[in-house]
């Protein structure tokens, strides 16, 4: 298998897996858990697997105080915060809609770079912003009384993930071995969400065997398939092509929502998805 084919396959597999996240979360919730508990187990149960992998490959676990401080910051306000917001949105709106709104993060990344880093923004990028906001408006319908809360949570998850993306690229954390950084981010996220779950009386150990098994597979595969697959794709086919192929994520989520959970999917929702995905593809294909 040549490197380009390998890059395409690993990126698609990664995107399809991430698109299955609502399925894992809802299975855990149906087995006695809740969205906050699912977020906790997603990070906590991955730690032993990551630790054993790092030790087996002789990777040092040491991290400087400066890098640790940066890791806590990017996790609380980005990486971990995103999971809490996105998972919580599943309680209010269809998972496919949640994932698609969340996938506005490439546009939020552009806005963040423009506003805070003073990067220049082309008219085409501004068009992408308009497409995304138009897509969100198409999602809204007056009959869905609780949808605004879910849409707001998914919307905020896109903003926090954009912060994670920008900060990760500008903070120097990328020099750290990928799985080592993921281990520390998962540890911080697990601690943060544990405190949140306990303080709100949403922490639970009363899961069915199926839910425990799902949580373990979910936690391990997210780090070892989702993250590594995407990184491999970026390495072999480049970030632009990898970004385009990652649009399989919201598409997968929408399909699972329809086939598994019989979630509604109107023409307006379809148009909303197309607007946002069009913006993502345009952003990914830009050279600047």
Locations of the language-model features?
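C-terminal transmembrane-helix exit sites in multi-pass transporters
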Residues: 49, 54, 105-127, 137, ...
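Hydrophobic/aromatic residues within transmembrane alpha-helices
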Residues: 28, 38, 42, 89, ...
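Transmembrane alpha-helices of multi-pass small-molecule transport proteins
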Residues: 30-81, 108-109, 160-167, 182-201, ...
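Glycine-/small-residue-enriched transmembrane alpha-helix faces in small-molecule transporters
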Residues: 1-37, 41, 143-170, 191
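Specific transmembrane alpha-helical segments of multi-pass solute transporters/efflux pumps
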Residues: 17, 22, 51-96, 102, ...
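Helix-helix packing/entry segments at the starts of transmembrane helices
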Residues: 15, 41, 98-104, 168-190, ...
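Hydrophobic transmembrane alpha-helices of multi-pass small-molecule transport proteins
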Residues: 112, 121-141, 193, 247, ...
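Membrane-interface helix termini and inter-helical loops of multi-pass transporters
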Residues: 23-35, 59, 91, 137-149, ...
């Amino acid at each position: 298998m040549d490197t380009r084919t390998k890059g395409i396959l690993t990126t698609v597999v990664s995107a399809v897996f991430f698109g299955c996240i609502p399925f894992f979360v809802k299975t855990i919730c149906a087995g006695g858990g809740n969205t906050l508990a699912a977020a906790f187990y997603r990070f906590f149960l991955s730690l032993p697997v990551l630790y054993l992998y790092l030790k087996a490959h002789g990777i040092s676990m040491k991290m400087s105080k400066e890098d640790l401080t940066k890791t806590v910051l990017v996790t609380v306000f980005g990486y971990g915060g995103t999971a809490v917001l996105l998972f919580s949105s599943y309680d209010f709106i269809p998972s496919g809609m949640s994932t698609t709104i969340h996938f506005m993060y490439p546009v939020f990344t552009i806005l963040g770079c423009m506003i805070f880093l003073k990067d220049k923004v082309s008219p085409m990028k501004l068009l992408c912003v308009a497409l995304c906001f138009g897509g969100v408006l198409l999602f809204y319908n007056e009959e869905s009384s609780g949808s605004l809360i879910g849409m707001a949570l998914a919307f905020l998850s896109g903003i926090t993930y954009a912060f994670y993306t920008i900060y990760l690229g500008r903070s120097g954390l990328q020099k750290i071995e990928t799985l080592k950084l993921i281990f520390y981010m998962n540890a911080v996220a697990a601690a943060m969400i544990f405190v949140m779950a306990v303080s709100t009386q949403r922490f639970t150990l009363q899961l069915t065997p199926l839910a425990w098994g799902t949580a373990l597979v979910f936690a391990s595969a997210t780090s070892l398939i989702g993250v590594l697959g995407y990184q491999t794709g970026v390495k072999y086919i480049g970030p632009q092509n990898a970004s385009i192929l990652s649009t399989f994520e919201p598409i997968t989520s929408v399909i699972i929502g329809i086939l598994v959970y019989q979630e509604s999917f109107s023409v307006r929702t379809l148009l909303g998805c197309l607007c946002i995905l069009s913006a993502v593809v345009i952003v990914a294909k830009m050279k600047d």
